[in-house]
């Protein structure tokens, strides 16, 4: 998508982002997402906007994700815009339904919904 001309913006929503790093050191979905976006930006520079939305009902989890990303990807503002949210997935999805139905055809929205944790 980063090289497709008909797409101007990509929004990626992780509605159960968790802590970002598992107790065994494995990386969770928000960290893997940032890694993937950085890799794509490094190999295929583009002016397309990539927006990441990381949400969890546990505020401490969201803070841990934010801290990890800021420490390990201090240049993240150069390759994406990250919004951190704290709330229930159900409420977030309700809020987004009306808004996303009005987005431009050049904007693509992806949702990662996994309440039980990402496993590779």
Description of each model-found segment:
Residues 1-95:
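SAM cofactor-binding core of SAM-dependent methyltransferases
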Residues 82-120:
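Active-site segment flanking the S-adenosylmethionine/decSAM binding pocket
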């Amino acid at each position: 998508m980063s090289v497709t001309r008909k797409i101007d913006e990509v929004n990626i929503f992780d509605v159960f982002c968790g802590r970002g790093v598992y107790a065994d050191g494995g990386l969770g979905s928000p960290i893997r997402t940032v890694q993937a976006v950085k890799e794509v930006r490094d190999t295929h520079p583009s002016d397309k906007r990539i927006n990441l939305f990381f949400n969890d009902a546990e505020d401490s989890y969201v803070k841990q994700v934010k801290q990890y990303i800021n420490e390990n990807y201090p240049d993240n503002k150069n390759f994406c815009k990250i919004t951190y949210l704290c709330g229930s997935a159900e409420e977030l999805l309700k809020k987004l339904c009306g808004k996303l139905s009005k987005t431009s055809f050049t904007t693509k929205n992806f949702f990662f919904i996994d309440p039980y944790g990402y496993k590779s």
